[in-house]
Amino acid sequence: MGKRIVILGGGESGVGAAILAKQKGYEVFVSDESSLKDNYRSDLQNAGIEFEEGRQNETRILNAEEVMKSPGIPEKNEMVKKIRAKGIEIISEIELAYRFKGDSKIVAITGSNGKTTTTALMYHICRKAGLDCALVGNIGYSFARQIAENPKPLYIAEISSFQLDDIKTFKPDIAILTNITEDHLDRYDYNFENYIRSKFRIAENQQPGDHFIYCADDEITMKYINRYNIHSNQLPISMKTELSNGAFIKDGDMYVRTGEDFTSMSVYDFALKGKHNQYNTMAACVAGSTMDIRKEKIREAVQDFQGLEHRMEPVATIRGVEFINDSKATNVNSTWYALESMTKPTILILGGVDKGNDYSLIEELVKEKVKAIICLGADNRKIHEAFGNIVNTIVNTDNALDAVQASFHFSTKGDVVLLSPACASFDLFKNYEDRGNQFKKAVKEL
């Protein structure tokens, strides 16, 4: 038999890794302390992979030569501590996938905000250019499973900090770091520098022929960039500074320069609206340019890209009140971007599982734009403390229907109801998609 690998966690990442490892001759065992979803259970059964659920066989796990840890499992998990203590190597799913990617190219996108939109736009640009590629990682299929079942010459991967935590050799040909803001601090011992280090790992194995695209206007990125030894070709993007390389926006026009290549287009032609999306669009355009995709194709893709569900998604306008679903806003910075783009009086639906939020970041915008806050969470004390003196109306709700009805009650014609929770969703919902879908359903029932 091949190398003994244990896969911790039987979700999308874990099952994808198990299928790839089995295909490549590993002796595979999947362990999940919760129960598996039916589709993942049958995937493992069909592939002839041994697994356990609802319990953990410590002896068998600690007999592994290598462990693949799913990104949702924190370091403070008891079993993870035991694996570390025994000195067994822990890798992430993207590390396993990378071993078997062959000659394929990887464009990897990470960042606290904007990574999903940038990844989806990048994929759209590549498809528009006729490239045979797959969307993998946090969005779409697990990277490992894609390689096992339908390998492609190009992968566009959305990568979280959790996936970067356990890489060893993973190296994207093009890495994009959209920005770094305080997020997931609960997973990084409430130490922001640990989280920052994780994000920069996207570039740590890159070589001079690779490209690293980052935001030169992002304070944290710029403060830390020189602490990490980045060998790749650096391509910054900015709205504040004219750059000789990378991309910048000036007087409503975007200019992209990568080596000899030069492109410009009006930001008014961007399908994605809002300042934050101008950064996302610049990053994807720079990446496309380094891949020698024709300017016309990049321009076309940027103009006809459809936005993503749960990201500033218009739901309906009812009696002159506009409803927007931004359920993907799981941190304060995302909500800052959403509020920043509001031009009408706003009823803000806020709350959920707080990941160490600093609400002072949105205090000024709330003062300026928000007429009422509807809390949608099991524990809303921090929201009341942060905004009790600023907003006259703050109401607690514990389900999407009540939140929507309350927001409609406090709204008048010409207002916007914005679901942009700044928190994770798992106190009351399965995930942010479930929260967004329940919000949309409640709006349709008004």
Region annotations inferred by a language model:
Residues G11, S34, I139, D217-D218, ...:
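Residues in the short beta-alpha loop(s) of Rossmann-like NAD(P)-binding domains
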Residues E52-R55, E93-L96, Y228-I249, A301-Q303, ...:
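Beta-strand->loop->alpha-helix junctions that form or flank phosphate-binding loops
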Residues R4, G14-K24, S264-K371:
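Nucleotide phosphate-binding/pyrophosphate-handling subdomain across enzymes
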Residues R4, K22-Q23, E58-L62, P71-A216, ...:
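Phosphate-binding loop of NTP-binding sites
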Residues M1-S92, L96, E385:
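N-terminal leader/targeting and accessory segments in enzymes
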Residues E27-E33, F212-A216, I349-L350, K369-A378:
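Short internal beta-strands
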Residues R41-S42, S360-D415:
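C-terminal helical cap/extension that packs against the catalytic core
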Residues A21, V67, I109, N138, ...:
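Residue-level signal for inorganic ion chemistry
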